[in-house]
Amino acid sequence: MIIRHLSENIINQIAAGEVIERPANVIKELVENAIDAQATRIEISIVNGGKNFIRVSDNGCGIPADQLTLAVSRHCTSKIVDDVSNICFLGFRGEALPSIGSVAKLKLTSRTQDADNANEISVIAGKIEGPKPAAANPGTIVEVRDLFFVTPARLKFMKTDRAETSAITDMIKRIAIAFPHIRFSLSSTDRMLMEFPATENNTQGQLQRITQIMGKEFAPNSIALNAERESVRLTGFTCLPSFNRSNSLHQFAYVNGRPVRDKLLWGAIRGAYADAIARDRHAVSIIFIDLPPADVDVNVHPTKADVRFRDPGLIRGLIIGAIHEALHQAGVRHTSTHSESVLTAFQIHPLENLKSAQRPFSYTSQPYHRVSTTTSMLQKPLDDSIDLREGIVPMMECLSAPSSDTRATIQTSPTEELHYPLGAAKAQIHKNYIISQTQDSLIIVDQHAAHERLVYEALKNALYSKPLSSQLLLIPEIVELSEEDAACLLTHKDSLQKFGLGIEPFGPGAILVRETPAMLGEINAQALIKDLADEAAEYDTTNNLKAMLDYVAATMACHSSVRSGRLLRPEEMNALLRQIEETPHSSTCNHGRPTYIELKLADIERLFGRK
């Protein structure tokens, strides 16, 4: 075999295979060029999902006539000279236009702001024609026809028109979020698919653009991010834990204005929500990272979708810290979508067979019992109300079954304070849900989910302050596991001991439990060990020690919290409400489920046709 130089056209086709995978990639490259040209209006038109026709026009600075040939030549660019480490533009390689022209029919028409007329140049299968005079407004128009007509085999890998159009809209949305001051529009065969008017280039304008794209639910459930560490600045918005999604498509990350899909950034977001969202759910977050260009390498992927940071630990720590602080500042807030879904679930149906139905038990003839709030529990914050030296057991014993004369309905005095965020307890229904009233709303609390969060936060506070005390089991328990699971769990033996959980090997595939945390009282050691073993493999590295410890705390909290089906006295319900108000991240349990739902009085009145 003879080694020979490849032709320029073949080189461009190879480059196109790396950069241009589908119509969305073509539009991405052209839109980024328009942004680099300081355009404030970008219009995109497509036919058949972009496979037959693409047109991108802008009102940017334009390209002079004598530079049009260079613009469609490989590795010709005005964006860098000799410093690849200091890239300040979205595009920089000079590959996009020649790559597109090698696999499609490309026509570029451009006019500078001070020119009398426009000029156009064409590239068909790598062959350049022109430039020649043309008529056009200041700016640039790029038309691409018959994508991949030179390489028909590539067309076999194209998806349906609808799928390609969906990929294009998703790509434009990602870019539009980062540039709210630019007007974007997308049309297909004379039909407008989406249009985003320009807004102010500030935080408020950014939130307005995000709301245009993400929907009206985003703003009331979002929390602003603003943090800085060394030379790195983080801004953007993240959402309440209970406002989550089943996939990560609603996570957007930008580095110096460039949309990226980086595992480090996704991992940092997941780590920040690790104890607030279920593992199969994903937070809704939009983050912008600005740092010196020399501190990030954007030239590590053909499509520039991945980046490499000089100090990844700094970036991860900044993201996790900023989100934790934002969630903490949010305090007792919950997502509005749960309330809306509850309202939607209400259906008005006439009650049938009222005459034949058995009359319900009436509480009117029964004595009412006032709420006797325990001042010490209401006024103390979480760390003080739970004496860790005596454990959580006294707190749990306080939440015991009520006396026989305690009724489900609670009479409150006229002077009872309703200005607490979660109000005053009024009733417990189905032995699991607490009904409370505020000045302008009704709140339903899941007592198990809420108490699970309280116990979890108490465990974490205790863990990071000092090792937890343990209690010896009178009869040690033997838990049978697979040999692999047992070996994996035993590698975390020292970490588990910090929680007061003492385990030892007991033959192949068996774990001997000698000690359990004293603060949890009596727990099901068998179930606890099996749950821990199921997850231990994922955290089987020293780098994830904190994640492992947090997971252990979450699992223990779940196994020791107040269970559904447990009756509570009025004072216990109110004490639980006050604890929720004092506890961080209390709007969700450790698994991401909501701990309470609020129905505004206006919504209730609307249900009954009063508004």
Swiss-Prot record:
Similarity comment: family membership: Belongs to the DNA mismatch repair MutL/HexB family.
Top-level taxonomy: Bacteria, Pseudomonadati, Pseudomonadota, Alphaproteobacteria, Hyphomicrobiales
Keywords: DNA damage, DNA repair
Protein name as catalogued: DNA mismatch repair protein MutL
GO biological process terms, semicolon-separated: mismatch repair
A Gene Ontology term for the protein's cellular component: mismatch repair complex
Job of this protein: This protein is involved in the repair of mismatches in DNA. It is required for dam-dependent methyl-directed DNA mismatch repair. May act as a 'molecular matchmaker', a protein that promotes the formation of a stable complex between two or more DNA-binding proteins in an ATP-dependent manner without itself being part of a final effector complex.
Alphabetized Pfam families for the sequence: DNA_mis_repair (PF01119), HATPase_c_3 (PF13589), MutL_C (PF08676)
A Gene Ontology molecular function term of the record: ATP binding
